[in-house]
Every structure is written in structure tokens, then in C-alpha cells.
Design a protein with these regions (language model features):
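Short linear capping/connector segments at secondary-structure termini
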Residues: 38-39, 75-77
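Conserved segment of winged-helix/HTH DNA-binding domains
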Residues: 78-90
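N-terminal helix-turn-helix
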Residues: 33-65
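Extreme N-terminal segment that seeds HTH/winged-HTH DNA-binding domains in transcriptional regulators
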Residues: 1-33, 39, 85
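A generic membrane alpha-helix/interface feature
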Residues: 45, 72, 79-80
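Beta-hairpin "wing" of winged helix-turn-helix
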Residues: 27-28, 32, 59-69, 75-76
């Protein structure tokens, strides 16, 4: 997953937004596993703590969930949650 970041906003917010974009476009479907924070940090060349902070935002919003010892997965209904959140922000 290739990501380019701007210097206007914190990187962890951009990570969360790009993951949401990937879910909306179908790159990650509901109940599908997403890259780990380590994979994300290596592919994006960012600190693992930054990747984790972005992912944790999505967990808090109910877009991703963690399966202990397995990884992170897209929640059922995540697409609608993202759309609703973005409509509210607009």
C-alpha cells in the first residue's frame, strides 16, 4: 500500500484517512485482514508507533477490529460508518 504524506496534517491522521480510502474503494473488504502496523510502517517508511496510532483511531471508530494473535480486520458495516462520518464532517 503506497502512501504519500503532506506536511500539513499529522501523519497518523493521514494513515487513518488513507486506510479509510482503501476500504471505501474496495481494496480491503469487510472482514478482510489489513496490513499489520509493522507492514504498514515498513511500506510507508514511517515509525511503527505512528502507524499504530493511525490504526488505533480506526479501531476506536469501529472501522477495524483486532483479533488477538491474528491481526487487524475490517469491521462489518465499516463502509457505511466511513461514509456517515465523512458526511457529518462535510
Amino acid at each position: 500500500m503506497l502512501m504519500h504524506f503532506d506536511s500539513e496534517r499529522p501523519v497518523f491522521l493521514q494513515v487513518a484517512e488513507k486506510m479509510e480510502d482503501a476500504i471505501l474503494t474496495g481494496a480491503f473488504e469487510e472482514e478482510q485482514q489489513v496490513p499489520s502496523t509493522t507492514e504498514l510502517s515498513v511500506s510507508c517508511k514511517i515509525n511503527p508507533a505512528t502507524a499504530l496510532k493511525g490504526i488505533n483511531l480506526l479501531v476506536e471508530d469501529g472501522i477495524l477490529y483486532k483479533k488477538r494473535g491474528v491481526g487487524m480486520f475490517v469491521c462489518t458495516g465499516a463502509v457505511e460508518k466511513i461514509r456517515s462520518k465523512r458526511r457529518m464532517a462535510f
